[in-house]
Amino acid sequence: MTTANVEQKVKNIIADQLGVGEDEIKITSSFIEDLGADSLDIVELVMAMEEEFEVEIPDEEAENIKTVQDAVNYITTHKK
């Protein structure tokens, strides 16, 4: 899976979970500051990404995933 594919799937998950348009989601978007997510939204996003990409994201790692780019980087690095 290419980085572009991962990025698109991450954006799809964010759009579904947060109810924002994909056109509002930039690679540099912060989940909390730019997309209006709260802590529960972040947990749900992480769970959705774990399921979609079949990757485990430990809580201490999830705390460092603050932007779309962070999520894409983590998934492309840790995906089997």
From Swiss-Prot:
Cysteine disulfide partners in this protein: none
GO MF, any single term: acyl binding
Function: Carrier of the growing fatty acid chain in fatty acid biosynthesis.
Gene3D superfamilies tied to this protein: ACP-like
Any matching Pfam family: PP-binding
Protein name: Acyl carrier protein
InterPro entries (UniProt xref): ACP (IPR003231), ACP-like_sf (IPR036736), PP-bd_ACP (IPR009081), Ppantetheine_attach_site (IPR006162)
Keywords, sorted A to Z: Cytoplasm, Fatty acid biosynthesis, Fatty acid metabolism, Lipid biosynthesis, Lipid metabolism, Phosphopantetheine, Phosphoprotein
GO cellular component, one term: membrane
